A protein has these predicted regions:
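Short acidic/polar alpha-helix capping motifs at helix-coil junctions
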Residues: 2-8, 27-29, 53
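Juxtamembrane luminal stem/stalk of type II transmembrane Golgi/ER carbohydrate-processing enzymes
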Residues: 2-20
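A short secondary-structure junction signal
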Residues: 157-163
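Short, His- and charge-rich active-site/binding loops that engage polyanionic ligands
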Residues: 164-169
Length: 219
């Protein structure tokens, strides 16, 4: 038995019952995720926007030849400076059965990571850990893929550490208000996005990149 089948057969990853009392596991989500990524691919190709599979989705291709067996979403990365173009492309070209959420289009999008969520409208799935900043956009509980925008960050370790420390001081009260008090602090989110933009512009040519200014990794 190959690795993928062994993992799947020994870990059903039950998603619970639907409204018709039928049990589902994560494998039932994968065909919809494939539909979503193919739609994103179509839109990006039409508008000449580069993208790449990232994080768990890239790992799944390498280790399993497809999805990680327990993965219930897909991860995609784009360049930070392509965000405005992707917003316009999704507004103009995304198919009617899909929807997208992002801060640049809807200030109710309170999520810090990812930058975008693209959803399949004719679906419903509720993220279990709602306290980790649930998407507050209307009708946002469909099956989705995540898109992160990669941005440059400082190479110098001291500057890097200072940025992380500063960012976390801004992030912690935002998360506390949104996740636990259920208050959406619009002003705090704007300041975080302004910081993101400032860092991205200052370190545009840096070989160090991050999906936000608070979770860095080396490219």
């Amino acid at each position: 038995m190959d690795k993928k089948n062994f993992v799947v057969d020994n870990n059903p990853y039950d998603l619970g019952k639907d409204v018709y009392k039928k049990h589902h596991d994560v494998r039932d989500v994968h065909p919809i995720l494939l539909t979503l990524i193919l739609e994103l691919d179509r839109v990006c190709r039409k508008n000449n926007i580069p993208y790449a599979l990232s994080f768990g989705s890239a790992l799944g291709i390498v280790n399993y030849g497809g999805f990680i067996p327990w993965d219930d979403d897909m991860d995609v990365a784009i360049d930070y400076f392509d965000v405005p173009r992707l917003v316009d492309a999704l507004k103009n070209d995304l198919g009617e059965e899909f929807a997208f959420d992002c801060y640049e289009d809807n200030k109710r999008f309170n999520v810090l990571i990812p930058t975008f969520k693209i959803r399949y409208k004719n679906s419903y799935i509720k993220e279990k850990y709602w306290y980790t900043l649930p998407n507050r956009c209307k009708n946002s509980d469909g099956i989705f893929i995540d898109i992160v925008a990669l941005m440059g960050i400082p190479e110098d370790p001291k500057e890097h550490y200072k940025l992380i420390k500063y960012s976390k001081r801004r992030m912690v009260p935002y998360v506390a208000l949104d996740a636990f008090l259920r208050i959406h602090p619009y002003g705090m989110k704007k300041k975080l996005k302004d910081l993101e933009r400032k860092v991205a512009e200052e370190y545009r040519d840096s070989p160090m990149v991050s999906q936000t200014v608070i979770i860095p990794f080396q490219d």
